[in-house]
Design a protein with these regions (language model features):
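HhH-family (HhH-GPD) DNA N-glycosylase catalytic core used in base-excision repair
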Residues: 2-308
Length: 308
């Protein structure tokens, strides 16, 4: 559609056709406060397409793949204690998806109780600690695989290509993350020449085929009845999902007992402490957080991502 014939848009770039707005209370399952800015900027993968994050205005714009078609929504700070959600077209399923992405179903009260007694992490109890997740586990797994053994620019290139070429399109022209079926239908040439995924191409296609054909239930990894060891074992069995990707995915699945120790976290910890530290020393520092040790470690590393 030519720009001259496109439906008018509001100040946020959303089509004015059948626009709507709603609010969700910014409160965790235990009644604890939620810091929206720290949630939408909680990790780098959160800013990959189709997400667009503006920390200056505390805004997340994203396009969701819903049963009745893709829809673009804008999530921003509303009145005190609430988050404002704006969209165009169908509203069904959007609030549930946003609640899921912001982890408003999680209770971090136990973590905050320990953090409050830790001088270096007391600040986190004001609402930090919710790692923005994708609408589906499949999307998070694909994005995580695209972060392995490459520069960040390559990760952005790969995920952008997947969304731009395979994602379902919303009325405003933006695209959601592709479905397993769409990724399974793409051939090897697409992954090699368009996505330029390298060795990951075969892994991504195989993963999508297994999910699409019902051989693999990635969404089942979100089952809280599974132990951390069971989830880790299933993740490690996925094509392209080694120890690093598994540790990263465990965090995105809300399983924080393990620390993500990699080429970024180790030197960042050393910089903040003023000296290098062995992995066992780092693990000892956060042992008191028990099931939240990995989350405490991550927040320690990323405190300066948001100005106090």
């Amino acid at each position: 559609m030519f720009a001259g014939n496109a439906p008018p848009r509001n100040a946020f770039g959303l089509s004015m056709a059948r626009t709507w707005s709603a609010e969700l209370e910014l409160k965790g399952a235990g009644g604890e406060a939620v810091d929206l800015l720290r949630t939408i900027t909680s990790h780098g993968v959160a800013d990959l397409p189709p997400n667009d994050i503006d920390p200056d205005t505390v805004t997340l714009t994203t396009t969701l793949a819903l049963p009745r078609g893709a829809a673009t929504v804008r999530v921003s700070a509303g009145r005190r204690g609430f988050v404002r959600i704006e969209g165009a077209g169908r509203k069904a399923g959007v609030l549930e998806a946003v609640r899921h992405m912001l982890r408003l179903d999680a209770d971090l009260s136990a973590f905050y109780a320990v953090a409050t007694a830790d001088p270096e992490l007391t600040w986190a109890a004001a609402g930090a600690g919710r790692l923005l997740r994708s609408p589906t586990v499949f999307e998070d797994v694909v994005k995580t695989i695209c972060t392995t053994n490459c520069a960040w620019s390559a990760t952005v290139r790969m995920t952008t290509a997947l969304v731009d070429h395979l994602g379902p399109q919303a009325p405003d022209g933006r695209r959601a993350f592709p479905t397993p079926a769409a990724m399974a239908e793409a051939d090897e040439t697409f992954y090699r020449d368009v996505v330029r995924a390298g060795y990951r191409g075969a892994y991504l296609r195989s993963l999508a085929e297994d999910v699409d054909e019902g051989r693999l239930d990635l969404e089942g990894l979100d089952d809280r009845e599974l132990s951390d060891d069971e989830v880790a074992e299933r993740l490690l069995a996925l094509p392209g999902c080694g120890p690093y990707a598994t540790a990263h995915m465990m965090m995105l699945l809300g399983r924080y007992s393990r620390l993500v120790l990699d080429s970024w976290t180790r030197p960042t910890y050393a910089r903040l402490r003023g000296r290098k530290a062995a992995d066992r020393t780092i693990e000892r520092r956060f042992r008191g957080y028990r099931d939240y040790a990995g989350l405490a470690f991550w927040l320690y590393l990323t405190r300066d991502w948001v100005e106090s």
